[in-house]
Amino acid sequence: MVENMRYALQRCCTTPVFLNQYETSTDAVLTKLGIVLVDIKEFNCCGYPLKNTSFKAHILSSSRNLALAEREELAILTFCNCCYGTLKHVNHLMRDDASLRKEINETLSKEGLKYDGKIEVKHLLEILYKDLGLANIREKVVRTFQDLKIATHYGCHILRPRQIVQFDNPLAPTIFDELVEITGATSVPWSKKLECCGSPMLGIDDELSMDLTQTKIEDARKSGVHYLCVACPYCQLQFDRVQRMFLTRRHSNHQLPSLLFTQLLGLSLGIDSETLGIDQNELDAKGVTKFLS
């Protein structure tokens, strides 16, 4: 097993309020795998919500967290695709633009901080796949799923823009699918796998948001899967809460529950469903335990 795996945790602002089970299941899974998360109390929001209102504030928010992680000599781990994409993009801009770096560092210096571009930003899936490795995860698996079919949904910000995030091939990614199949489940191909879940439109045009979600869910159902599986809090909220919304509003019975990847992997690692918060999902996903060997 890989030793001394410590990362600074960039929390998602959404999860403590709307998706606490993602935090608790991630903590349980990483503890089981020997990965240590360090809470840097001074961390702020990644700045994603500010991108289109105040670009400099957006840059400063991410740069501050990057500088704080640098001070601790820790790479940043996040399980939020929006945090991941934002921090990766800002890290890229700050490394490339000397004048921007100088301007932001002048502000950071008021707190005794400095950005030097020395640390990396990593998604939870990236750490599991690249840093820990499939073989090391398999050693910890104690139960596997039988005949369970899963539709993986990567989410937009983890894959694009490719030249900045450098996570996987954005047109034909495999990392998430390989991680899912460690559990014994089968990752089933489906045509709309890489399309947006509809989350960015929620609150702007709810009907369009629900249309995008419903189209994806109907396509996934046609592939014969039992569950969706995601690793982004906003995508999970869309497939869980918003799916419930359109099932009610549109009088539909064609539901497809969604699981967080940490819930799926956690069950294979022998963690109980209560700790993983499966009962906290809006749509009932507790039946997944019936597929465990």
PLM regions with names:
Residues 1-293:
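Iron-sulfur cluster-binding electron-transfer modules in prokaryotic oxidoreductases
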